[in-house]
């Protein structure tokens, strides 16, 4: 659980920014969005395979660019 204590002299907007940073650091929003809707295991597997292929293609493109220089 993320908690932020606001001091008497502290600006509220500064505390809000600190809160947002803490949430991003703990990846709460990302996890919430991931679990918002049920995904079948097969759908998850297909997404992971597509992401892997995209990353591999990107690595190949970068490698080709380096060798062409």
UniProtKB/Swiss-Prot annotation:
GO terms for biological process: translation. GO terms for cellular component: ribonucleoprotein complex; ribosome. GO terms for molecular function: structural constituent of ribosome. Residues 50-69 are annotated as: Disordered. The keyword Ribosomal protein applies. Keywords: Ribonucleoprotein, Ribosomal protein. Gene3D superfamilies: Ribosomal protein S8. Pfam families: Ribosomal_S21. Transmembrane segments: none annotated. The keyword NAD does not apply. Disulfide bonds: none annotated. InterPro entries: Ribosomal_bS21, Ribosomal_bS21_CS, Ribosomal_bS21_sf. It comes from the Bacteria. Belongs to the bacterial ribosomal protein bS21 family. This is Small ribosomal subunit protein bS21. It comes from Borreliella burgdorferi (strain ATCC 35210 / DSM 4680 / CIP 102532 / B31) (Borrelia burgdorferi). The gene is rpsU.
């Amino acid at each position: 659980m993320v908690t932020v204590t606001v001091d008497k002299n502290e600006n509220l907007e500064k505390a809000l920014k600190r809160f947002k940073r803490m949430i991003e650091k703990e990846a709460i929003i990302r996890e919430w969005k991931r679990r918002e809707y049920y995904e079948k295991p097969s759908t998850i597997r297909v997404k992971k395979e597509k992401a892997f292929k995209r990353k591999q293609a990107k690595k190949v493109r970068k490698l080709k660019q380096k060798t062409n220089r």
